[in-house]
């Protein structure tokens, strides 16, 4: 159990009764808004071609059961003196590799003394000692029940029904233009790739590629994404925000105090909460999500702006282990912002429990943080950065303390950059690399401008800079200049010594002269580095005291 305990005033029975009634109204208000809305779907087609992998003892009995209804192929991982006779293909395989999803699995295997073989299958029953597909979230159509007989029986029963056409929602939307994964071959943000428990997101050069067939809909990628380039679409953040806003409005109207949302999944988390009965504190409002990793600081800030005294996120142990670390990091960032604005906390609680008595204890110590004096009326946007702007503007306007800026931990999606002016040559590589439009050139003048509001701290500018002149500075600024283009560096322009046209900066030319002075290509021609590109070519093509044929004397 991972919870943050805080001391709270003794329970007032009268107020607790009001809270319970107000919670009932809040739940009804949230339920009146659909949890989902129509979405784009992803389709699968399965004809039932089934691959069973395992030892003869483990695989053949289950293959026999499946073969009565499905076309089966078996790969045995142990040597056989005599190959078992079956009405379906049985082979011995030393190595087996499987990849894919329902209706589109590709398997490669090699039998002793034989070349590598391959086949396509719709379903896979993996009874091998180590799973062939190791991802935490398994692809649809892939079953690896381990050694538990009940789990194997359940898997086989499910597989018998997996023939036909199937569909699921497309859980994500991706805007390549704002993705901070890479620019010009330089790598920046890989948060979504690293967090995905289904291995559905891959590097694709300067962008990412999301496989909708592997995506399991956890939404952790959208929580980790600093720009909002990848967003959760089932449900979108705007719909979750509507449910929160409606619930809090009804809770306030019912006389409830200090409301806290407990975000849970609709299956295991909901079942755990249902076991609490009257032990559930009146001010705790359960709110089901498709997955508990699908919300982060944008939705949480909005909830606090709407009047929520806290957010508890319930993990039941079935989630990928990296999700807890992600949510903990998000809570650290969010609490740093609220604390810096003078909102006494804590406001956030990460619960990792699998028993109702543990959950009851944890929720009795649910957050009771300070909230704005006036609840916000804005609606969440499906664009993450817009929602953050709305929420932070409201929180700052009503904040007990109004600092110019709040220091944030590393990994926060807000901040500035520091430029070493002595090292920076104003080559503008960083401007071309910035995916968020935070860095801008001088429109012909040798200067570097920066809009802090746009910066997502992806680090592409720092990794691109050839002079290593850029350092990230995570923080959240509330100064008016945050949305303005401020000059980080400027230099006097350098004019071509031949045509007098500006073509760079004095510092850039001096750096080139220092680095290339001893280069044989410029031996005796260093002045060419002081020329613009056109004049440099002209100078190279002009004759230098060469003897012309016409100048030769005839005898």
What residues fall within each predicted segment?
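Helix-enriched interaction subdomains in cytosolic or periplasmic regions
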Residues: 1-29, 202, 206-240
